Swiss-Prot record:
One of its GO terms (molecular function) is RNA polymerase II cis-regulatory region sequence-specific DNA binding. This is Nuclear factor of activated T-cells, cytoplasmic 1. Plays a role in the inducible expression of cytokine genes in T-cells, especially in the induction of the IL-2 or IL-4 gene transcription. Also controls gene expression in embryonic cardiac cells. Could regulate not only the activation and proliferation but also the differentiation and programmed death of T-lymphocytes as well as lymphoid and non-lymphoid cells. Required for osteoclastogenesis and regulates many genes important for osteoclast differentiation and function. Residues 184-279 are annotated as: 3 X SP repeats.
């Protein structure tokens, strides 16, 4: 105190004419520190103390007058203290009262721990350094004289009062009181965000504080009035997100403790920041994850469905003296120890009926949901378009036709298209060689449901077709575009979806597709990428369609266009083969082949190459070109002979046109055919030979393992193999050359039905099969007449041929 009085820097008596008389000299210390006169009652209403304040301000503070004497009165150095200025128009020194706001340097002595009921006997003298009670703060007492207190400004709203609301604070479980004019009835709207020095700070988790009994509390309360054990012991971040969260001490160096006193002027409106407890916040969550979520919810609490003053934001609601009986502040008693604050039981449901919808979990659902985009696609896709959850990958090799379906490119794209970069505008859609744009049609589809045609950019090298790494399809829009399209991303590849409509015969004109060039460095640095962007500038338009089948499966067809050169430099320098007059030729060579394309020179070379399965070159030969017939768009080549003249099957090779060391065209295919291949007409052999079939034929013809190519009338080597059923078979182990009796059993014992032979064939007239007498084996003497033996059927011999 004495140090401050002796310091000339803080003596503003001359500036404000405090010491103009002897009486003022006596009252200077009290006036210098903003103390009221001893005779002024602490419970005097603010209207009497400050007649210059407007009526709304008096009304707001009338309810707090009863506690001002206890809450703010104290004794410092055996002198009376207060926080209310003297009433009347004449100041203690006899000077007239200033009508306009004035600046005072007031020594804020804080709340003495021996006389204030808000402080507890918690001794932290050993932990915290003592502060000198000579700290001066800036106070603007007559702020309300020119500002309507009913309309809270951002400076005096919740975000600037982090002791009452944590919407602007990163502290998740508690806040700190202010050893500044924030706790006085006269608050400055522009208080400094940092009233303590960095070295005066302490760890954020050492103290907890509730709401101080200030008559100027915020109309809304913080959800952090409930400090549970979990929230108290939780981890704290090192720095807050807002400078408004201040750490305060008493001027005696003691840390301020919690206050169990609620605000005397609670909010009349049901704020969502009241009674949001552990079990009502996100179900089973025991503590708020971060006050940033609460701040976001508070900022979004302007929805009319929450009954917050018809959609008026919380910070802009006008406070009145109508106390709502259904809303009360949730206050918990201070714990005996700073680290053992007991959890407080939740509110009763009957006391807070207005917040039952918050308990039901609708609070976060209403304010954290993202609305749908208000601008839908102008040309939406047909809802009947088929989409399968398990479609083949884009790098799968699919056929272009299957069964009755065929996907065909009716009009091929132009061989050159300048792709645009990401940093420049579009260069238009891909065009066709003869003008217009490419077109694709699905043949064989007779259903009435539309399908979706997928288009992506694929590779054009000699490897398997796959999505291109350096080029993507680009959707073109504009007045001249007649085809609807939609962009989609499939496995990091942009795909353009185009409807195929039955009314258009399942045909689509591709006037909505451009080509986008990606940056080489972005692609080349990918893991596993081996291609080089500047050497891979050719692409293909790949079209794919998925056709649903009646059995529930999906038939996927794919077709790729001719190569398209996307680089302007490459299109001007590299040769390009579009057509070739011959696709195959004999191994002897010597035939002519005409190539059509671009960038052909007089010294252009055509190289034929045969590759091994591993990619190595097995054979390479330069073809002879006719320079006198060479043109920039055509080239005449004589096919060279193949390396092996004795091939027995066609061999496929490749060839390319070369204009220089690194100026080569794409590989083209050519097939060598074997020379002097005899053309022999062969017929497949019949596995069923009825002429050599013997045995039971009631069940049809039986296959023979080995056909008999002897004379038609000769007996087989094993006569027992052709015996009818009823004859004993020949013993397998007998080596005797003696022949067995070949007499047939009576026909009645056969299994054949009447009118049919034992072989199942119709009987001729007389009941005897047409037969020829078999020659008698040599060495067998003639015996008595016997029944005719079974004969071999010859399908080529008619019954009349026996005569």
């Amino acid at each position: 105190m004495t140090g401050l009085e002796e310091d000339q820097e803080f003596d503003f008596d001359f500036l404000f004419e405090f010491n103009q008389s002897d009486e003022g000299a006596v009252a200077a210390p009290a006036e210098h520190y903003g103390y009221a006169a001893p005779g002024l009652g602490a419970g005097l209403p603010l209207s009497a103390a400050h007649p210059s304040l407007p009526a709304p301000c008096h009304d707001l503070q009338s309810s707090a007058a009863g506690v001002s004497a206890v809450g703010y009165g104290g004794t410092v150095d055996s002198g009376p203290s207060g926080y209310f200025l003297s009433s009347g128009g004449i100041r203690p020194n006899g000077a007239p009262a200033l009508e306009s706001p004035r600046i005072e340097i007031t020594s804020y002595l804080g709340l003495h721990h021996n006389s204030s009921q808000f402080l507890h006997e918690v001794d932290v003298e050993d932990v915290l350094p003592k502060r000198s009670p000579s700290t001066a703060t800036l106070n603007l007492p007559s702020l309300e004289a020119y500002r309507d207190p009913s309309c809270l400004s951002p400076a005096s709203s919740l975000s600037s009062r982090s002791c009452n609301s944590e919407a602007s604070s990163y502290e998740s479980s508690f806040s700190y009181p202010y050893a500044s004019p924030q706790t006085s009835p006269w608050q400055s709207p522009c208080v400094s965000p940092k009233t303590t020095d960095p070295e005066e700070g302490f760890a954020r988790g050492l103290g907890a504080c509730g709401l101080l009994g200030s008559p100027r509390h915020s109309p809304s309360t913080s959800p952090r009035t409930s400090v549970t054990e979990e929230s108290w012991l939780g981890a704290r971040t090192s720095r807050p997100s807002s400078p408004c969260n201040k750490r305060k001490y008493g001027l005696n160096g003691r840390q301020l403790s919690c206050s169990p006193h609620p605000s005397p002027t609670p909010s009349p409106q049901g704020s969502p920041r009241v009674s949001v407890t552990d079990d009502t916040w996100l179900g089973n969550t025991t503590q708020y994850t971060s006050s940033a979520i609460v701040a976001a919810i508070n900022a979004l609490s302007t929805d009319s469905s929450l009954d917050l003053g018809d959609g008026v934001p919380v910070k802009a609601r006008k406070t009145t003296l109508d106390h709502s009986p259904a809303v009360a502040l949730k206050v918990e008693p201070a714990g005996e120890d700073l680290g053992t604050t007991p959890p407080t039981p939740d509110f009763q449901p009957e006391e807070f009926a207005a917040f039952q919808h918050i308990r039901k979990g609708a609070f976060c659902d209403q304010y954290l949901s993202v609305p749908q985009h208000p601008y839908p696609w102008a040309r939406p896709r047909s809802p009947a378009s088929y989409t399968s959850p398990s479609l083949p990958a884009l790098d799968w090799q699919l056929p272009s036709h299957s069964g009755p379906y065929e996907l065909r490119i009716e009009v091929q794209p132009k061989s050159h298209h300048r792709a645009h970069y990401e940093t420049e505008g579009s260069r238009g859609a891909v065009k066709a060689s003869a003008g217009g744009h490419p077109s694709v049609q699905l043949h064989g589809y007779v259903e009435s449901e539309p399908l979706t045609l997928q288009l992506f950019i694929g590779t054009a090298d000699d490897r398997l077709l796959r999505p291109h790494a350096f080029y993507q399809v680009h959707r073109i829009t504009g007045k001249t575009v007649s085809t609807a399209s939609h962009e989609a991303v499939v496995c990091s590849t942009k795909v353009l979806e185009i409807p195929l409509l039955p009314e258009n015969n399942m045909r689509a004109t591709i006037d909505c597709a451009g080509i986008l060039k990606l940056r080489n460095s972005d692609i080349e640095l990918r893991k596993g990428e081996t291609d080089i962007g500047r050497k891979n500038t050719r692409v293909r338009l790949v079209f794919r369609v998925h056709i649903p089948q009646p059995n529930g499966r999906t038939l996927s067809l794919q077709v790729a266009s001719n190569p398209i050169e996307c680089s302007q430099r490459s299109a001007q320098e590299l040769p390009l083969v579009e057509k070739q007059s011959a696709a195959s030729g004999p191994v002897l060579g010597g035939k002519r082949m005409v190539l059509s394309g671009h960038n052909f020179l007089q010294d252009s070379k055509v190289i034929f190459v045969e590759k091994a399965p591993d990619g190595h070159h097995i054979w390479e030969m330069e073809a002879k070109t006719e320079g006198d017939l060479c043109k920039p768009n055509s080239l005449v080549v004589e096919i060279p002979p193949f390396r092996n003249q004795r091939i027995t099957s066609p061999v496929q090779v490749n060839f390319y046109v070369c204009n220089g060391k690194r100026k080569r065209s794409q590989y083209q295919h050519f097939t060598y055919l074997p020379a002097n291949v005899p053309i022999i007409k062969t017929e497949p052999s019949d596995d069923y030979e009825p002429a050599l079939t013997c045995g039971p034929m009631s069940q049809g013809l039986s296959p023979l393992p080995k056909p008999c190519y002897g004379q038609p009338l000769a007996l087989p080597p094993d006569p027992g193999a052709c015996l009818m059923p009823g004859f004993p078979p020949r013993p397998q182990g007998s080596a005797s050359p003696e022949l067995h009796d070949l007499s047939c059993a009576p026909y009645g014992s056969a299994t054949a039905g009447p009118g049919h032979s034992p072989l199942g064939l119709p009987r001729p007239v007389g009941g005897v099969l047409a037969s020829q007498e078999a020659p008698r084996p040599s060495g067998v003497p003639p015996g008595p007449p016997q029944p005719p033996p079974p004969t071999l059927l010859q399908p080529q011999v008619s019954p009349t041929s026996s005569g």
